[in-house]
A protein has these predicted regions:
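Conserved SAM/SAH-binding beta-strand->alpha-helix loop
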Residues: 135
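S-adenosyl-L-methionine
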Residues: 143-159
Length: 159
């Protein structure tokens, strides 16, 4: 199993302690945002941590993925298409990690669906995505993005 978690520097020690205590291998990746906007801190918020936890994991060596620990992708600007979500992740970044840690037809789970970047990346890479999002607004954003990307109509299953 591979698990990825985006977090800030304050949560890093807690996640890494949990990982060691639970017997997971881990790696710390950095999402470098070249277009970060200064927000009054002593340094620009131009990185975000992406933690990788793994146990009995799949690795895909030899793909066209970027295996660097420093992943450079511009931040995604808020827009109506992504529901003005405050922490949109670039589809290319998510797709890169999915390529590394899964195979075609694998199942990818995202417990924090947000604007749906993981779902779109899975569609591009022929993976099955199971996603959870509690905020009805962002559920609609995810469905709309998926429908626009695939040209299909989502079906509500109530059972």
């Amino acid at each position: 199993m591979n698990a990825y978690v985006f977090c800030n520097k304050e949560l890093l020690p807690d996640y890494l302690d949990w990982c060691r205590d639970s017997g997971y291998s881990w790696n710390v990746l950095i999402w470098k945002k070249p277009t970060a906007i200064p927000i009054g801190d002593s340094h620009r918020p131009d990185i975000e941590y992406l933690l990788l936890f793994r146990k009995n994991a799949i690795w895909n060596n030899g793909t066209d993925a970027n295996y660097s620990r420093c992943l450079i992708y511009d931040r995604v600007k808020k827009s109506e298409d992504n529901g003005n979500h405050p922490t949109i992740k670039p589809i290319e970044l998510i797709a890169n990690e999915i390529k590394i840690s899964s195979n075609i037809n694998s199942i990818v789970v995202d417990f924090f669906g947000g604007s749906g970047s993981t779902l779109i990346a899975c569609e591009q890479l022929n993976r099955t995505c199971y996603m959870c999002e509690l905020d009805p607004h962002y559920v609609d954003v995810i469905v709309n993005r998926w429908e626009a990307f695939t040209g299909q109509t989502a079906e509500l299953i109530t059972e």
